[in-house]
């Protein structure tokens, strides 16, 4: 069912939000999604109590995902990266000028560019998952009363194809539309760190070295 139960401390952290950001605990590809608070995440999802485009965008960037892979360890036969809140999220040096303890994201550049790129990525992924003409959107009266958003029901002629439209499959395929939006987001996040020289060709090692330097400088401050 769509009900499920959230741990009380997680439920408390979502007070006043309509959505939260989440990522699978163990996944071959590290991606983040936003889910309505009525949807109780499976226990295998890591919940981050933010709904804004800015935090969703920073976490979805190559920069954060590299940090998470480097710090989170790996698990299982597939040796898949694990996301651990205390190792991957709480240690992450967010861009200067951004304070996670502030409930409202800062306005103006460079943050507006991240939020816009993140919203565009989110929109594009949604359209890929539920293409127009493939699905009808429906809610039962009970779901409506509980505040659930409508959910997609595939049209019979598209049902088999729609079933294959999962985020894991999307990130396996990495179509040009996804790549373009991901690179735009990565660039916007890199600029927030002051890395004007960022390109997709920048090595993972360079990015991690810079993040570690940022982290050390902040710890020393």
Would you name each region that the model predicts?
Residues 1-221:
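S-adenosyl-L-methionine
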């Amino acid at each position: 069912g769509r009900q499920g139960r959230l741990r009380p401390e997680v439920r408390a952290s979502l007070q006043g939000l309509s959505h939260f950001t989440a990522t699978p605990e163990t996944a071959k590809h590290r991606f983040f999604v936003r889910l309505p608070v009525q949807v109780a995440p499976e226990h295998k999802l890591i919940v981050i109590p933010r709904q804004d485009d800015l935090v969703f965008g920073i976490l979805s960037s190559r920069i954060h995902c590299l940090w998470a892979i480097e710090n989170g360890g790996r698990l299982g036969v597939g040796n898949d990266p694990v996301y651990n809140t205390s190792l991957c999220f709480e240690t992450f040096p967010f861009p200067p000028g951004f304070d996670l303890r502030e409930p409202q994201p800062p306005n103006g550049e460079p943050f507006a560019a991240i939020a816009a790129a993140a919203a565009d990525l989110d929109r594009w992924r949604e359209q890929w998952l539920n293409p127009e003409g493939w699905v009808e959107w429906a809610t039962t009266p009970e779901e409506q009363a509980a505040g659930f958003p409508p959910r997609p029901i595939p049209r019979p002629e598209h049902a088999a194809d729609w079933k294959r439209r999962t985020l894991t499959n999307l990130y396996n395929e990495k179509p040009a539309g996804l790549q373009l939006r991901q690179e735009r987001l990565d660039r916007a996040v890199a600029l927030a760190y002051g890395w004007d020289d960022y390109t997709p060709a920048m090595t993972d090692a360079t990015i991690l070295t810079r993040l570690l330097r940022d982290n050390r400088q902040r710890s020393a401050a």
